């Protein structure tokens, strides 16, 4: 049945990693709890709540619920846990640190990584989306991405980045195809980017907690709102289904909150 479930998911618009996660979850549940019934499902939920963060718990429960839908057992579906939203953004690279990292990468001749960081912070691209950028997209100034629901999201490449990236591509003789490649000439992986970011954070004495791929997407959103306060437009640029998701960028980071309190509160 799990194999049939996997084949069913593969025909949907779910990302490959999501399919893998759902199948792994169902297999784990069946191996450890056996029969699918309310008692076992609640026991599994209890195990998740005790051992994982709410977001992870809900991801696992989503996989279980998808399986219950597939096996026509919707009545057994498990409720998600409530995720307490923090009133500040966590682990977002500061604008100063972003500029510092860019400058160091440029000075040390890490041109490809200089552009990886710049592209992420200047386009708001997810790391998986970044890998789809080709030389042809630099020429036209944008990349069209297709979301799970079949919607098109346009990733715009700002003029100053286009100009410098085009110059770099001419220097390395790359006229077409994917621009971010590993030493074997193959597309770099998301894991490779994450690993290299950790290396650079250590090399330049930066906080590893803020030097990770999604941090630069957060920085794009924060910088955009600081300079052009249009939440609806930002939601479109980020590819958010709901503007409520984008509202988090109206919040300050924890360090920003601390600085404001230190400056304002003198009584």
Task: Give short role names for the model-derived ranges.
Residues 1-267:
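Conserved catalytic core of the tyrosine transesterase superfamily
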């Amino acid at each position: 049945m799990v194999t049939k479930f996997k084949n069913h998911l593969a025909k949907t618009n779910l990302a490959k990693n999501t399919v893998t996660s759902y199948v792994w979850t169902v297999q784990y549940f069946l191996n450890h709890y056996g029969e699918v019934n309310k008692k076992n499902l609640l026991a599994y939920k209890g195990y998740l709540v005790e051992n994982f963060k709410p977001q992870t718990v809900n991801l696992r429960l989503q996989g279980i619920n998808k399986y219950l839908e597939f096996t026509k057992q919707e009545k057994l579906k498990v409720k998600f846990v409530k995720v307490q939203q923090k009133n500040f953004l966590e682990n977002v690279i500061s604008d100063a640190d972003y500029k510092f990292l860019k400058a160091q990468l440029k000075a040390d001749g890490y041109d490809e990584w200089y552009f990886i960081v710049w592209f992420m912070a200047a386009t708001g691209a997810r790391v998986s989306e970044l890998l789809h950028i080709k030389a042809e997209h630099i020429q036209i100034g944008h990349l069209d991405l297709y979301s799970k629901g079949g919607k098109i999201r346009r990733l715009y490449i700002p003029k100053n980045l286009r100009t410098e990236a085009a110059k770099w591509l001419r220097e390395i003789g790359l006229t077409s195809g994917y621009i971010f490649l590993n030493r074997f000439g193959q597309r770099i992986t998301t894991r490779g980017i994450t690993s290299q970011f950790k290396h650079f954070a250590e090399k330049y004495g930066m906080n590893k907690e803020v030097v990770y791929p999604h941090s630069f997407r957060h920085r794009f959103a924060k910088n955009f709102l600081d300079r052009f306060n249009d939440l609806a437009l930002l939601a479109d640029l980020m590819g958010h289904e709901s503007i409520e998701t984008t509202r988090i960028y109206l919040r300050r980071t924890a360090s920003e909150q601390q600085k404001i309190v230190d400056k304002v509160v003198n009584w």
